[in-house]
Amino acid sequence: MFSGRLPHLPELVVMIDAELLREPPPSPFLGHDEFDPEGLLSGLLLHKFVRLYRYADNGPPPSVRPEPPPEERPVHTGWVVLDPPNPNHPGRRVVFFREAPTSYTTSAVIGNAADVAAADTTTDAYRALEAVGASERRRADGLAEQVAEQGVHADVYVTRREYLAKATRRMNRETTVCTPEEALTLVSLYLRQQGEFIAAKPDRGSEFVMNRGLFYWVAARELLPEAWRWFAACAQHSAKVADDRMTYLGQSLLQRVARALEARDAVHVSSNQPQDNDLKDEALANTDEVLVLLMGAVDVTARVAHKAAGLPDDDVRHAGWQKQQWLRELGGQAPRVAELFVPESQLSDVITVLRLLRNSVHGVALQGLSLMEDNRPMRNLVGLPQDDEAKLLEAIARLGGCKRWSVVTHPRPLGSIFEPATLVDILFEHVIKLLNAVMSRTPVEDLEGVHLAAEHLGPPSARGPNSTWDPFEEWTRLSIRWQLGF
C-alpha cells in the first residue's frame, strides 16, 4: 500500500544548446578521457523521465535530417526551432518535435526581452567584440532564453552563453538557466528523487545503476579519502582486542556523513520549488538533520583521537574539539592534531558555526521566515540563533564572509538570515575538510594491533574476474562527486 509508485514527479523538460550535448555520450570504459561532467550530463539527459530538446541560433545543422513533414513543413526530432520573423505577427513561432513522426508542437515567443538584452551594456559580456556584434550576441542570448521559457516551457536551460551568465536581472522566472556542471547537479537530484541512482548512462538502453544506500555510501567514501587509513586502523584494533566498539565508532562517522548527504538533498529539493509554509518547515527539519549528523560525525573523530592518543577511556565523554581542557590534554600526546583547533583557526571557526547552529536543537529552534522583495518570488529563509548571533557572524566572517554563506543582517526583529541550501552546502564543504584534516593527523597507527599497508590507504580493487564494474572505481566515485556538486 505504501510502496513507492514511480515516477511521482512530472517529466523534467530540458533545453540545451546543441554544441554542449555529446552524442553519443562518452562511456566511462571506452571514452574514459572524455568522461567528464558534460559527458555524464549528456547521458543522464537520455533518461526516460527527461524530455530533451536541442537548440541552436541558426537551427539544426544540415547533418540533422528532417522527418517527413506531417503537414506543410519538415520537423527535426529532438529539436526546437525558431521560425524567422513574420511581419504579419508580433511574435516568433517556435516548433518543437520529440519522437512521434506524425505530429509536432508549435508555440510562440512574445515580448521585447531580446531587444532589452541587445541594449543591455551593464555587463562586460562580449566586450571583446565591436558594439554591433556584441549587441547581436546579447540579442541571440536573450531570444534563446525566451524560447526556453515561453516556447518550450523548459524547467532547465543548459547553456554557456556569456550574457546569460552575467546578466543580473532578466525577464525569465520559470526556467532555471545554468551551465552543464550546474545542470548535472539538478538533473541528478531530480532523478534521485525518482529513485534513480545512476553512475553513468552511455546510451538510452544501458546504464550503471546503484541502490540509494550504496550511492551515498560511495559518496561518503569519495569525499573522505583519509577515512580509508583511519577506518582500517579502527577495524584492525577491534580485531586485535576482540571488541567491536572501535569498528562501530569509525563506521558511525561514515554512516552519518552518508545520511547527512541524503538530508542535504532534501534541503535542496525543498528549496527548488515555488515556496510555501510547508516547504519552509521541510527545509528547517532537514537543515536540523544535517547539523545533527555532521556534528555527530565530528564528535566521532574526537573520540577516536582520544583513544589513539592513549588518554583514559573513562574520560572519553569529555572528548570534543570545542573543549579547551580536553584539547590541552590531547596536545600533550598528539600535538599535530590538537594544534588544528587553536582559537580562531579555520577549523576552530568551523566547529563554532556547526556547534552553535546544532545547539539550536537543545533550545529555541531555528526560525524560518518568508520574504518577498521587489516583486520577486517568495523565498524561505532561516534566522541565525539570536543568543549566538555575534559569535556566528565573527566565525563566518573569517570563513569567507557573510555573502558566501548567504547571510544578510537586517535590523531587529529580522536579524541575520540565510538561505538554508546555500549555508548547508558551504558548511558541508568545510566539515568535509575538517574531517579529512583530523583523520590524516590522528595517530591511529599507535592503536594496539594496527599494521597498515598500502592497500589500506585507498579504495579496494573489488572487481572480480567475472565482474564488469566496481562501484569504488575512480570514474564511479568522480561521477557521484560531480552529481552531488562537490
What are these regions (language model features)?
Residues L40-V64, A297:
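Short internal beta-strands
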Residues R245-Y248, S252-D265:
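Mature extracytoplasmic or otherwise solvent-exposed domains
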